[in-house]
Amino acid sequence: MTLIHMNVLMAFSMSLVGLLMYRSHLMSALLCLEGMMLSLFTLAALTILNSHFTLANMMPIILLVFAACEAAIGLALLVMVSNTYGTDYVQSLNLLQC
């Protein structure tokens, strides 16, 4: 395993630890999820480039599309919660009922 792969895996694990530690605030959870998605994108791109598997070239692009959708939905939820309750606590999400 090369140094680049180890750095990407360490970035993923640090984002996962951050998500587990700072899960009370929605903004912190969204930032940790974005870090995880970025490290997954980097790892997928490196793996495909190193293995010369040309059929899977679209996988990192599809992962980026899902990450952008996740970020947009997360930010919309963050704005909705902060406008409604004035805080970004994840506990406020239980109060959002239609």
Swiss-Prot record:
Family: Belongs to the complex I subunit 4L family.
Keyword annotations of the record: Electron transport, Membrane, Mitochondrion, Mitochondrion inner membrane, NAD, Respiratory chain, Translocase, Transmembrane, Transmembrane helix, Transport, Ubiquinone
Keyword Transcription: no
Name of protein: NADH-ubiquinone oxidoreductase chain 4L
A single GO BP: ATP synthesis coupled electron transport
Species of provenance: Balaenoptera borealis (Sei whale)
Main localization category: mitochondrion
A GO cellular component annotation in the UniProt record: mitochondrial inner membrane
Cited Pfam families: Oxidored_q2
